[in-house]
């Protein structure tokens, strides 16, 4: 039985994993993402435990997130290590992360500040990363439209929660932040997984590997700016500044939700990629040129960074869907680069800024953070260029057309009793290929190719290639008309 995708109207048929999307499942990613944003930009640790503890906690949190990503990536091929970790229920991971988050808000002094705080931050960061990877590993097997809508709606929900926590009394806000990982893990544990065909191409070519390297450089560039901006935010513990800071990501997330719901995945890909770097550039310019709109400029910078971050998740979901690489490998690799670059950006501003800033440390830190933002725009613009993004989008479009045709051919093959080799020949014929092309592609003799072609025509009840093409498209149209919408309950 097929189904019609709620956004594209295309039919998805298959036997592997399918997310039967229910709206409240977006809140799983939203809760975990909200935890990260509140810990980096909420300022609650500073208002409760003091400025010094907040500065240290952010650095240790980023280190813990990076450690979780490194561990996940390193253990992807080690079954003895990865197996026990993957068998741990998400709720247990979320409960441990929430417990460690409570310790972060407890005012600490002396030796405890350098023993208890690092342990709590690193463990909570690792728990966050394990939950994010587990959740996005599940969602990466959904179609691009569904994965994009889930991540963007989760981001919007996260920003709303972050603003809510800022306006709350510090103790109440800390309590909310402490339970976010647990809530996210409970929702993740309840996410329903069905069956769907995982659409995959072969291993990436050398050109695709170069593109993957450029994507990782792009991830490192905006993540470095994210870390530097979080260090800048730690200088001001006032709720007003943090609300203004989160307003940009909130507006950006709402915009991306609208685009993913309104446009096809290739169009949404292109528009989201076009948003990130220009918005960061405008934010840097306003912050440097107009002192009175400093908070607004920082808000735009963070909004652009969030757009780049969401684009990174969409690209990862696309890579997982189109290659044979495991989801945990692709996602952990990007998260590892993201966390390490963010930690480097944070350390650059938080450590070098006061050391080199002399009498005017705050102004120097601000300038250094803006320089990091400008560098991210330069790297993002000249390493992962608009040409690379367009090539990725065009390959997505070609893959989607090929996948849809392959679905129809697979259904016809099952109905008409074609052999696997005959199905391959029929798919090439439905694409309009001739006999020499089929011989070269499948590495078969001329007589063998002609025999398979005759068998395909005979079993499907057509007399030539044009009739087969028409028959395939008619079958595809019927599949779409007969598709069943997924349940929303």
Please state what every model-predicted region is.
Residues 4, 33-43, 66-67, 181, ...:
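Linker/hinge segments immediately adjacent to helix-turn-helix/homeobox DNA-binding domains
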Residues 19-27, 54, 80-92, 143-152, ...:
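Membrane-interfacial loop-to-transmembrane alpha-helix junctions, especially the N-terminal start
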Residues 54-78, 251-256:
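Central cavity-lining transmembrane alpha-helices of secondary-active solute carriers
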Residues 92-110, 277-292:
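C-terminal ends and interior cores of transmembrane alpha-helices
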Residues 112-131, 295-309:
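Hydrophobic core of transmembrane alpha-helices in multi-pass small-molecule transporters
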Residues 128-151:
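Cytoplasmic helix-loop-helix junction between adjacent transmembrane helices
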Residues 144-169, 333-348:
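Glycine-rich segments within core transmembrane alpha-helices of 12-TM secondary carriers
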Residues 398-453, 458-459, 470-489:
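Helix-turn-helix DNA-binding segment
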């Amino acid at each position: 039985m097929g189904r019609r995708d709620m956004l594209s109207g295309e039919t998805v048929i298959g036997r592997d994993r399918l997310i039967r999307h229910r709206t409240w499942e977006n809140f799983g990613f939203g809760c975990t993402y909200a935890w990260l944003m509140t810990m980096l930009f909420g300022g609650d640790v500073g208002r409760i435990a003091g400025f010094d503890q907040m500065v240290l906690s952010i650095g240790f949190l980023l280190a813990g997130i990076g450690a979780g990503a490194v561990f996940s990536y390193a253990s992807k091929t080690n079954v003895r290590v990865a197996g026990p970790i993957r068998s741990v229920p998400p709720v247990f991971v979320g409960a441990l992360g929430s417990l460690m988050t409570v310790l972060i808000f407890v005012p600490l002094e002396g030796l405890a500040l350098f023993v208890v705080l690092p342990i709590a931050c690193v463990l909570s960061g690792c728990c966050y990363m394990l939950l994010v990877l587990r959740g996005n590993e599940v969602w990466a097997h959904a179609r691009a439209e569904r994965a994009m809508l889930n991540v963007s709606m989760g981001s919007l929900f996260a920003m709303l929660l972050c603003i809510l926590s800022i306006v709350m009394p510090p103790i109440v806000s800390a309590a909310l932040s402490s339970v976010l990982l647990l809530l996210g893990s409970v929702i993740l544990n309840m996410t329903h997984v069905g069956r769907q065909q995982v659409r995959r191409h072969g291993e990436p070519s050398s050109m695709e590997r170069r593109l993957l390297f450029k994507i990782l450089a792009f991830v490192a560039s905006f993540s470095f700016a994210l870390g530097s901006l979080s260090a800048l935010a730690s200088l001001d513990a006032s709720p007003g500044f943090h609300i203004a800071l989160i307003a940009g990501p909130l507006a950006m997330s709402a915009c991306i939700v609208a685009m993913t719901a309104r446009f096809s995945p290739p169009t949404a890909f292109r528009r989201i990629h076009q948003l990130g770097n220009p918005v960061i550039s405008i934010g840097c310019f306003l912050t440097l040129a107009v002192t009175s709109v400093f908070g607004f400029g920082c808000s735009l910078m963070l909004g652009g960074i969030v757009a780049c971050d969401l684009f990174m998740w969409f690209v990862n979901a696309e890579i997982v869907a189109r290659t044979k690489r495991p989801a945990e490998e692709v996602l952990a690799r990007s998260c590892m680069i993201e966390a390490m670059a963010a930690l480097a950006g944070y350390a650059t501003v938080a450590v070098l800024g006061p050391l080199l800033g002399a009498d005017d440390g705050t102004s120097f830190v601000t300038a250094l953070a803006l320089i990091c933002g400008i560098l991210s725009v330069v790297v993002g613009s000249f390493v992962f260029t608009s040409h690379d993004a367009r090539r990725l989008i065009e390959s997505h479009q070609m893959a989607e057309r090929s996948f849809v045709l392959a679905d129809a051919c697979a259904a016809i093959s099952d109905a008409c009793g074609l052999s696997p080799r005959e199905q391959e020949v029929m798919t090439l014929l439905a694409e309009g290929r001739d006999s020499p092309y089929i011989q070269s592609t499948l590495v078969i003799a001329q007589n063998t190719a002609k025999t398979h072609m005759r068998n395909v025509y005979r079993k499907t009840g057509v007399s030539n290639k044009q009739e087969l093409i028409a028959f395939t498209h008619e079958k595809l149209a019927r599949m779409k008309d007969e598709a069943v919408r997924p349940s929303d309950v």
